């Protein structure tokens, strides 16, 4: 191309030749007129001659023809012919090179050469060289950013970096050191070119306040059922009272599984006597001829040692007759116009077997037979109930007393009776339609088979007031508990002490990580202070757990393990319990009363058999201040036996 020819053209030998040529031009073409041949002799080459001669004729036209005027002069800018002609061979006038990029201009034979400044290229030095794209010097030698500029370039750094003295390399700026308060109360962590304000897990950085703020995970619906947010975290809970427990993911809820199925088969011909915690199961009213004497026959089954079987009274309440159980034996109490009497006797019948009992009023006595064998004969003056208007009218209550009759008895009795009755015949009137009444009511039906014990169905609790103060040391208290348990589910609260809305002590079961075993948890408020792991409690056998706790001592034992627990933490937790024991605590068996769901680690009801001894006293659920109706005080369903496999 043309440009390369320009670059390789031979340079004139030296400035001496230039001077010679200038003198020849003056002589030949300015002082004299020259034709093209004479001009060729001056330049000694064709390109320059061809370039010069037309322009020479132009100068002659301007000046020799006396046409020089102010206008003309201003047009070509030459004052006289000499100036006009001398300027023609100078290819660098007017300047053909880019002013920004050229260093100087070299006149040549009918051409010119632009010498470029560093950073420029092109025939006229009009093209900027992009040093940032130079393959031999990648990125212009800059470590981060190369900025190309007209005729040059410079290096710069990304945000968060500073330029080193060599003006090419960048170094990370440690914002955490430069601006110590940049993150406020959060922790500043320097990163390449930047910094981060870090918060602990469960907190989020607020750039406006420059502080860490607690994330309310509960507002993000993290939990399936119940959620409690606390600074830096959250906990999920499930409604144990509805039979749910927390799943392995600690967020979802799952049904508390049954680990030991029970035989809950019922029969409507068996009347369950403990359906109500207070009051009778049902009552009958008789309106019979006046010659009728009192009689009652029935089959009876119980493990309970005390309670009311039947209570009969006149309509005006003045006369009454009681058939009860005391210490496992039949007791008769009655009061009429003639006498008030009490008799207990016969053999013990609270053996869980069916016993046929008959009570019959004879002319001068009341005869009591068990299995048709006479066991008692009670003398009585006159008839038990006095007829009115030619009729004998009585009310007979099953398994309970009406109103506040307890106070009127000759000897007080706990009326509650966990037992079953079948084949009853009162006043010789047969079943008196009772079967039809109870047939529709599941709750009045008895389990076909039961064992000795107490049963918690996983739906309620029993409440006791127990004084734990040690009588010999007034300042001291002691809780010694023995539990005989046969759980049917692996999760539930067995025993808890409640003070207001808090639970200063609880003993619970939770399903272990293994399907077949359970853990025992001891907790103070909502903290587990001890966990006894992996015991197989759902085997169908009774297991005995013992624990004793005082203000500075906790001991737990099972048939396989005896543990005396001691730790600094334990002392702190026992101090919480000690404080509660100075006030009033209520004892609950089988679950929790209405307290906040997060008051304790486990809130499911206990499901299964359990007998409890506290400080040497066997607790009788009939003596509870209150008890859920479905808790059985003296009977427990048998383990379900798949009849098809046996």
Swiss-Prot record:
Residues 270-446, 455-636 form the Laminin G-like domain. InterPro entries: Coagulation_fac-like_Gla_dom, ConA-like_dom_sf, EGF-like_Ca-bd_dom, EGF-like_dom, EGF-type_Asp/Asn_hydroxyl_site, EGF_Ca-bd_CS, GAS-SHBG-PROS, GLA-like_dom_SF. One of its GO terms (biological process) is blood coagulation. It is found in: Secreted. It comes from the Eukaryota. Keywords: Blood coagulation, Calcium, Cleavage on pair of basic residues, Disulfide bond, EGF-like domain, Fibrinolysis, Gamma-carboxyglutamic acid, Glycoprotein, Hemostasis, Hydroxylation, Repeat, Secreted, Zymogen. Residues 88-126, 128-171, 172-213, 214-254 form the EGF-like domain. Residues 59-87 are annotated as: Thrombin-sensitive. Disulfide bonds join 29-34, 92-105, 97-114, 116-125, 132-146, 142-155, 157-170, 176-188, 183-197, 199-212, 218-227, 223-236, 238-253, 420-446, 609-636. CDD domains: EGF_CA, LamG. It holds the Pfam family EGF_CA. Residues 1-12 form a propeptide. Glycans are attached at residues 470, 480. The iron and 2-oxoglutarate dependent 3-hydroxylation of aspartate and asparagine is (R) stereospecific within EGF domains. GO terms for molecular function: calcium ion binding. Plasma. PROSITE patterns: ASX_HYDROXYL, EGF_1, EGF_2, EGF_3, EGF_CA, GLA_1, GLA_2, LAM_G_DOMAIN. PANTHER family: LAMININ G-LIKE DOMAIN-CONTAINING PROTEIN (PTHR24040), VITAMIN K-DEPENDENT PROTEIN S (PTHR24040:SF0). Anticoagulant plasma protein; it is a cofactor to activated protein C in the degradation of coagulation factors Va and VIIIa. It helps to prevent coagulation and stimulating fibrinolysis. Interacts with C4b-binding protein, a regulator of the complex system. In rabbit plasma however, protein S appears to be present only in free form. This is Vitamin K-dependent protein S.
């Amino acid at each position: 191309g043309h440009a390369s020819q320009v670059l390789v053209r031979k340079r004139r030998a030296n400035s001496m030749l230039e001077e010679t040529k200038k003198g020849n031009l003056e002589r030949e073409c300015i002082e004299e007129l020259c034709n093209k041949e004479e001009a060729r002799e001056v330049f000694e080459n064709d390109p320059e001659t061809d370039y010069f001669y037309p322009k020479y004729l132009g100068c002659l036209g301007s000046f020799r023809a006396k046409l020089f005027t102010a206008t003309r002069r201003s047009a070509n800018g030459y004052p006289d012919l000499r100036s006009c002609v001398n300027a023609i061979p100078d290819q660098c006038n007017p300047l053909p090179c880019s002013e920004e990029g050229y260093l100087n201009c070299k006149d040549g034979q009918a051409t010119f050469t632009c010498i470029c400044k560093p950073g420029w290229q092109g025939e006229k030095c009009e093209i900027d060289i992009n040093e940032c794209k130079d393959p031999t010097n990648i990125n212009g030698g800059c470590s981060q950013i190369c900025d190309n500029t007209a005729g040059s370039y410079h290096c710069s750094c990304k945000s968060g970096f500073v330029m080193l003295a060599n003006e090419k390399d960048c170094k990370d700026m440690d914002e955490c050191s430069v601006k110590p308060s940049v993150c406020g109360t959060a922790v500043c962590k320097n990163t390449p070119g930047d910094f981060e304000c870090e918060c602990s897990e469960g907190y989020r950085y607020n750039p406006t306040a420059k502080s860490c703020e607690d994330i309310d995970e509960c507002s993000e619906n993290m939990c399936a059922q119940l959620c409690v947010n606390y600074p830096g975290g959250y906990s999920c809970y499930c409604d144990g009272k509805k039979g749910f427990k927390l799943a392995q993911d600690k967020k979802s809820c799952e049904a508390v599984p049954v680990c030991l199925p029970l035989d809950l088969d019922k029969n409507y011909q068996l009347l369950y006597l403990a359906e109500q915690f207070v009051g009778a199961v049902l009552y009958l009213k008789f309106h019979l001829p006046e010659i009728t004497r009192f009689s009652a026959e029935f089959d009876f089954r119980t493990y309970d040692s005390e309670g009311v079987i039947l209570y009969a009274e006149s309509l005006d309440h003045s006369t009454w007759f009681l058939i009860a159980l005391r210490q496992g034996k039949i007791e008769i109490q009655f009061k009429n116009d003639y006498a008030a009497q009490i008799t207990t006797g016969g053999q013990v019948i609270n053996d869980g077997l069916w016993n046929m009992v008959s009570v019959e009023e004879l002319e001068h006595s009341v005869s009591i037979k068990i299995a048709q064998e006479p066991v008692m004969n009670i003398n009585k003056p006159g008839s038990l109930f006095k007829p009115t208007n030619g009729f004998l009218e009585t009310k007979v209550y099953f398994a309970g007393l009406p109103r506040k009759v307890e106070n009127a008895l000759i000897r007080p009795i706990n009326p509650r009776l966990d037992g079953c009755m079948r084949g009853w015949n009162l006043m010789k009137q047969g079943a008196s339609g009772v079967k039809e009444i109870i047939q529709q009511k599941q709750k009045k039906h008895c389990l076909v088979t039961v064992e000795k014990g107490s049963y918690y169905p996983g739906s309620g609790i029993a409440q006791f007031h127990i004084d734990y103060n040690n009588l010999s040391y007034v300042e001291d208290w002691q809780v010694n508990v023995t539990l005989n348990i046969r759980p049917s589910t692996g999760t539930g609260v067995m025993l808890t002490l409640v003070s207001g809305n808090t639970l200063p002590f609880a003993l619970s079961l939770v399903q272990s990580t293994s399907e077949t075993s359970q853990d025992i948890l001891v907790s103070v408020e909502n903290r587990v202070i001890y966990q006894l792991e992996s015991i197989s409690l759902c085997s169908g056998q009774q297991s005995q757990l013992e624990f004793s706790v005082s203000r500075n001592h906790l001991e737990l034992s099972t048939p396989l393990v005896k543990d005396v627990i001691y730790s600094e933490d334990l002392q702190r937790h026992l101090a919480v319990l000690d404080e509660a024991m100075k006030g009033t605590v209520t004892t609950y068996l089988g679950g929790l009363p209405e307290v906040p769901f997060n008051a304790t680690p486990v809130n499911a009801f206990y499901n299964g058999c359990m007998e409890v001894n506290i400080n040497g006293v066997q607790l009788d659920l009939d003596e509870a201040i209150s008890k859920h109706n479905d808790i059985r005080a003296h009977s427990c369903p048998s383990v379900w036996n798949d009849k098809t496999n046996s």
